[in-house]
Amino acid sequence: MMENNNSAFSYNLTKLDLIDNSGKAWNLIPGVQAITYYESICDPYVSANIRILDSGESVINKIVGGEEVHMSVGGPDEVEYHYILMVYMVGDRSVSNKIQTYNIGLISAESLTNESMKISKSLTGRPDEIAKKILEDENIIKTEKDIFTTPCQNNTKIHPNGKSPFTVINSLCNGSLAAIKSNVKGSDSSETTTKDKSLGGSAGYVFFENRKGYHFKSIDSLCDVKGEFGGGGEIRTFIDSAEGGVNEDSIINVNFESEINLIHALRLGTYSSQLQTYDISSGKFEVYTYNLSKEWDNQSHLGSQTKLNPIQKKLSEQPTRILSTIVDHEKYYNGTDTADPDDP
């Protein structure tokens, strides 16, 4: 039987019911050996694993997959948290002396819907609006959970080609640019000549789910300690957790695999990089240059560093990574006449 209040955080499991296909609720608490709950900013779902020791009624015989599990947990802040997850897996089953143990895998209901849905229709607009539309559309995910987004300043058009909804949203993350503190501007000339432009702002979003709902947020907003990039302006550090006492936001362990590697950073173009594009329809060749020294103040930063040191400024002077790609503005134009390459 699971022992409640067995951790420093004093979490209480107050409810754990499995609803079978007939609608009957089965209390799983007496047989629970362990529960592991997972959230990650890299995953568009929450999941859990329950280890069951079953010596009485064989609950496993009632499970066929897709059942709801209602879970309530009392936290150290004296607030009760409620979760409704779906059974997607039963495994690691063993039987000995009329006692069987097994794992029940739980996941968000939307994740099961995601696996059964494919999107083929082209989607146009701001990435954050596209993500929200996919999640709310009654013909796609149709979630009733809250959705939190950081507004994007760029528009895009995506051709999913039968990809799953979550895959489509994840594909928008790298090319999404937050509207706050961005200096990217459209082209102001139709000349088919080389133009060197400064690429500003900080691209990069993450799509994930936690107990509050779905998030399509810019990395800058998540790292925002000053409230300048759409974030809350509050970051809880490991030191805060150690000195601030026990609560639901306490960080109990931190592992840094790699912190500083200048060679790796230079090869990735962390300090300065260049993007070269060639439009095969218009013949226009453009060059976009990213320089960390110029863009430092347009980004949010974690840690104690408030400015670049001399060597970092020097490493920002020349692009250390050059990327090139072929584009075709006609591909994203819906009209019947010739598209204007300078019309966003």
Predicted segments with their positions:
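N-terminal export/assembly leaders
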Residues: S47, N114, A131-P160
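Short alpha-helical segments in extracytoplasmic peptidoglycan/chitin-binding modules
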Residues: I134, L172, L323
